[in-house]
């Protein structure tokens, strides 16, 4: 399938997608009933959508095009409430978090969708192991060249995005020692990590054509890069975050990304080049392993700073752009989070250390999501 032309979007408009866990009380294992919920709820929604993801324990909710984070919050809240009502009718519960702490990937049923069936043909058991839960944020751009500049600019902050939403320390009933273990599930994918270097949209067209020769890539949806352009929507899509435990956190990270995008495209502070990505895997790993306590290394100077420090140093620079976008509350929340030692991943560990069970942890997450 040829690459679509880049659809011109209003700059800095937003779209948010959240992959949620569908669980069965009282044991709180993953359910295989996403289709039941979707059939119940899809005709009740007046904004956004609820749809399948790759397995039947995953429910994706998504906004439409939003002007600002307040608009996005209104849409997501309405969808959340409709899904909660449907879940109660079917004796199910919903929660956030980047991974379920004790599910068996072998029992996950692939959703009845031709694209997902093809994914299984390509990736085998890796597709079932991808029963993990992420947040994606789309930011509108006016052109393909703007989208490529923004993609490279936001790639500098991938560790920050991972660390702020890190909520998947438990996997396969084991403390992984990672703040975000979710991204490790994709490490065997041939397109894991950053997009290959291209400088402009013309170069991206060539790249997509070359990738299509593999017979694995029919559309942009078949690419699993950390950040990817979405020409059909006219956006850049950031894909590295765990789904957080609360809707508020999902809004805060979206506002932070939107504010960064506004700064990057307005001031053009960087001259992007391929060497920018030399230490990308190492800095990304630090965020996955240690969250906000991870250490970032500057690719040119060798200077090292914690992710917390970088976020706090960015805040003053971003403040006027947050004000412009009506995202000041989101930026302030991110700053508070960077100053706090109580990450979502650590709170999960503390719950278990204080005598809680893994099923009790999922129950708690369901209560948090429903609150």
Curated annotation (Swiss-Prot):
For whether the record's keyword set contains Ligase, the answer is yes
- Specify one Pfam family: GCS2
Q: What EC number(s) are associated with this protein in UniProt?
A: 6.3.2.2
Q: Where are the transmembrane segments?
A: none
Quote one Gene Ontology molecular function term.
Answer: glutamate-cysteine ligase activity
- Enumerate the UniProt keywords alphabetically: ATP-binding, Ligase, Nucleotide-binding
SUPFAM superfamilies from the UniProt entry? Glutamine synthetase/guanido kinase
Q: Which family does it belong to?
A: Belongs to the glutamate--cysteine ligase type 2 family. YbdK subfamily.
Protein name per its UniProtKB record? Putative glutamate--cysteine ligase 2
Q: Which organism is it from?
A: Klebsiella pneumoniae (strain 342)
Read off the lineage from the record: Bacteria, Pseudomonadati, Pseudomonadota, Gammaproteobacteria, Enterobacterales
